Amino acid sequence: MEREKVLHTLAKIARDLDRDINRTGARHAAAVVYKNQIISYGVNQRKSHPFHSRFSEHDDAIFLHAETDAIKNALRQISEDELEKATLYVCRVKYDSNGPNKKLTWGNSKPCIGCRRAIANFGIKDVIYSNDGVGNHCLL
């Protein structure tokens, strides 16, 4: 599956997380791709979840991140051995300004320390994440 296609799909999911035009901040979405198919999605959530707390950097950082949500959901579809062969994609969208003409653009979605810990724990070697600017992406 093409990187750009997966990232654009995630950008749409992240954009639609909150339709409130007055909301500031960023939205994250992630996907696990295995054998050229998206097998799971994940999004940032404000509710706590024990799965993320296993990997968080701080004891109070227990909210489910898009990356850990996608990994958690993937484990319902594939084994941990198969997950090692999968690719994790992460996308962030954010507003380019605070004015009346603000638009959503891609942002840096490099996984945090806790998410990188989860990625390493499950042996995921290929991670692709969006970077600031339209269409930019990086490899972890």
Language-model-detected regions and their locations in the chain:
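Short, basic/aromatic recognition patches
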Residues: 1-26
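Short beta-strand scaffold segments in enzyme catalytic cores
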Residues: 25-41
